[in-house]
Amino acid sequence: MNAEEKKGLQRAIEEITEIAKGFGLDFYPMRYEICPAEIIYTFGAYGMPTRFSHWSFGKQFHKMKLHYDLGLSKIYELVINSDPCYAFLLDSNSLIQNKLIVAHVLAHCDFFKNNCRFQNTKRDMVESMAATAERIKHYEQVHGIKEVESFLDAILSIQEHIDPSLVRPKLQWSVDDEEEEIEEAATPYDDLWSLDEKKPKKQVKKSKKPFPPRPEKDILLFIEEHSRELEPWQRDILTMMREEMLYFWPQLETKIMNEGWASYWHQRIIRELDLTSDEAIEFAKLNAGVVQPSKTGINPYYLGLKIFEDIEKRYNNPTEEMKKMGVQPDSGREKMFEVREIESDISFIRNYLTKELVMREDLYLFQKQGRDYKIIDKQWKSVRDQLVSMRVNGGFPYLTVNDGDYMKNNELYIKHWYEGIELDLKYLEKVLPYLFQLWGRSVHIESVLEDKEVMFSYDGKGVHRRYL
């Protein structure tokens, strides 16, 4: 990109920013960087401009860069949720491509700033991840690259299993606190005479405390706090990895909403620009490529856009029933901003994917049968419920620690809350040894396989399967 093109881009950024503000978008200060493909794909693989080194990121970079070199896919931009918000543009983009991208990332930044799921996000995560990378590099120098990399392998295999509720009471309990004395009334009426000085002697009963007292979703935190295997440097790395995952988690919970919101606004903003005929044609092609539906999956840009457009249409022209509920005509845009603020993908789909929209967009459920894919259901509620199910827990299996002292031997017992989708057995058998590495004792995972309850265990020697 030459100097003249950079000046043109700067003018376009200023104009697009003013248009976005005029529409009511509220975003952090923006910082734009123009980067070559090598840099963009490095950021894409690592997830951030500054992050610790790991072989899995290199593998992802090679795959993405190869697809780019072969013309199979292309990343036009990357946007970082921070304050200020950073957007990285590919240096080979045309001016109209960059105009679309600037409008798109402004809407992303508005979403980051205003959606309730992002309210506890650390806005200085770029600097925080840079500090994490330095600390991990230090541990590699002290303990060896292989030792640290092996530990990172274990953490990254279960990194999604955190509790995204950042504000919650801290539970105080310990594996050493196995028994407590419970006072029982000598008679059913003792509590009625509790003020009497001559109370009957209490009976004392010893009872084993559950550990944890209730199922614990945050497996990383549980291991961090209670594993007897971890050294201080390992516990430190585990803490940092959990913090990074907490940063990424809201993006997993709002993927469809976020992309739909950005797609809606880049269309509206670009329409306000004075485009040449060539630019208008190129924009139409680019936009069609971004929001086109897929026959074999869900395009989050497309689905999110269609739901937001449907909200605007229905609330601009409310039915008599909606009017009785207090909905005012021409309130579509206001409702969209409200939805953007308070919903996640699950509630967004459950509350706003209507029967009419499912039928109009011809959404359906399909299944692979032999070599072919067959449509198995077109009922709108089935489609909606399946989409909601796919977004539960960010799309990852819901696991909880149910016992940290299983068999009274400090073994770890994890339960998979089965809801119709079985665990990937190949992945499960690879993850169990990593859990053993982190916990230091035998690890068990309860799940359902072929409609039968089954427990998978790893004792340091091999994976065993037992039907319950």
From Swiss-Prot:
Residues passing through the membrane, by range: none
Coiled coil: none
Top-rank taxon: Bacteria
InterPro entries on file: Spore_V_R (IPR007390), SpoVR-like_C (IPR057008), SpoVR_N (IPR056174)
Gene Ontology terms describing biological process: sporulation resulting in formation of a cellular spore
Keyword Iron tagged: no
Keywords: Sporulation
Pfam family for this entry, one: SpoVR
PANTHER family: STAGE V SPORULATION PROTEIN R (PTHR30029:SF2)
Family statement: To E.coli YcgB.
Functional summary from the UniProt entry: Appears to be involved in spore cortex formation.
Listed name of the protein: Stage V sporulation protein R
Organism: Bacillus subtilis (strain 168)
Recorded name of the encoding gene: spoVR
